[in-house]
Amino acid sequence: MANIKDIAEKAGVSVTTVSRVINNHPYVSEDKRKRVFEAMESLEYTRNIHAVHLSKGFSNMIGVVLPTVNLPYFAELIAGIADAAAESGVHLSLFQTNYEVQKEIFALSQLKQRQVDGLIFCSKALADEKLMEWEGPILLCQNSDNARFPTISIPHQEAFRNGLDYLIAKGHKKIAICLARKKGMNSHFRIKAYKEALEEIGEAFREDWVIEKAITINDGKALFHKWNTWKEKPTAIFVANDQVSAGLFLEAKNQRVSVPDELAILSVDNHEISQALGITTIDIQTREMGKQAFAILEKRIQGQPIERKVLDYRLIERSTV
């Protein structure tokens, strides 16, 4: 395999000149640049990009840590990250964890070993205190009280409260909520908003009306049947996921339960499925979050100060409330 010295000899220039051409240095004459390119083509030279990056102290690779790629929320987030990474010529390495701590730690070990230049945690099981034990640029796509990490998020407590107030203004007091998991930081803020809203309207908090482990359309269908078995039924369910909302809506329709007359559904995401089914939802700019997550992490890798950004949200009225 040809090396830089071989190219220099064939082109009749110095090794320094070849290096300048390969690294796109401006101070090389067009004649010499042309001769170097011709020599590279003749010798079928392929630049070892990985070696170049390592010599400069970075891998040109960003790690993206997420529980699954099979949900539209994470797919949208990755799409935004990928769009921004492509514009910067940076490659992505995905770490799918299923919220398993050891898999998250493996991703962190790749950062420690400089296999990636930084990590974007889309969602995680590890506590922030555990992340503090690891060095390197780490960005969180969620709220965090820890000032060590750059973050990008929406104000989940405020957005959820906005949705609850909307339901209350529509006449609903018996409201259930459905989350992906109760342990997450975002869910912590949502439950807090829920309790505060109930207290203000004089309704008791009911633990059984806080449903979790629901992320798919089938989970939404199961949620309908859970609702249907309750002796005292909530008149509205606030679901933190468009997929679950879609399953709930479709099963209600299949069972001839009128939405919103018998059951109102409010969702979060504003993905295509909620648009197609006419589900009222809160747009949280998932793709934009991914783009800005990459931009913030890239600046951090370059040594710029920690940035903590909060995106806007908006409630989109359709036909399910």
From Swiss-Prot:
Entry keyword set: DNA-binding, Repressor, Transcription, Transcription regulation
PROSITE patterns reported for this sequence: HTH_LACI_1, HTH_LACI_2
GO BP, sorted A to Z: regulation of DNA-templated transcription
Single GO MF descriptor: DNA-binding transcription factor activity
Keyword DNA-binding: yes
A matching Pfam family: Peripla_BP_1
Residue ranges flagged as DNA-binding region: 4-23
Family annotation (SUPFAM superfamilies): lambda repressor-like DNA-binding domains, Periplasmic binding protein-like I
Ranges for domain HTH lacI-type: 1-56
Keyword Repressor: yes
PANTHER family named in the record: CATABOLITE CONTROL PROTEIN B (PTHR30146:SF105), LACI-RELATED TRANSCRIPTIONAL REPRESSOR (PTHR30146)
Protein name: Uncharacterized HTH-type transcriptional regulator YkvZ
Originating organism: Bacillus subtilis (strain 168)
Lineage: Bacteria, Bacillati, Bacillota, Bacilli, Bacillales
